[in-house]
Amino acid sequence: MAQVQYYGTGRRKSSVARVRLVPGDGRIIVNKHDIREYIPSEALIEMVKQPLVLTETLGSYDVLVNVHGGGFAGQAGAIRHGIARALLEVDPEFRAVLKRAGLLTRDARVKERKKYGLKGARRAPQFSKR
């Protein structure tokens, strides 16, 4: 008999995470590594677990993630977004809780490009009156 799996794709900055939820004991595997080996910050790990905590499904599913692009913060955000989307497949009743916490909305903030004539995206060179 085939095992039940739930899929979700999450994105944040330049990171894309493909998430699979499989009934299990709550392990989170990111790119074939345990999440504690892959993501160095405890705060980011807590952020990743947020959708599972809100829906009270923390120990019920193993989370298998394939993520690429960006840095640790962007990847953690993408994983969180993917888990939230996969949980909707598990039970559509979770939508209200996840939506209220803002976990279903794709965070569209990305780094603004540097413009010529300026030091950064908006920072102008120092102005000298004389």
Swiss-Prot record:
The keyword DNA-binding does not apply. One of its GO terms (cellular component) is cytosolic small ribosomal subunit. SUPFAM superfamilies: Ribosomal protein S5 domain 2-like (SSF54211). GO terms for biological process: translation. The keyword Ribosomal protein applies. Gene3D superfamilies: 3.30.230.10. One of its GO terms (molecular function) is structural constituent of ribosome. Belongs to the universal ribosomal protein uS9 family. This is Small ribosomal subunit protein uS9. The lineage of its organism: Bacteria, Bacillati, Bacillota, Bacilli, Bacillales. The gene is rpsI.
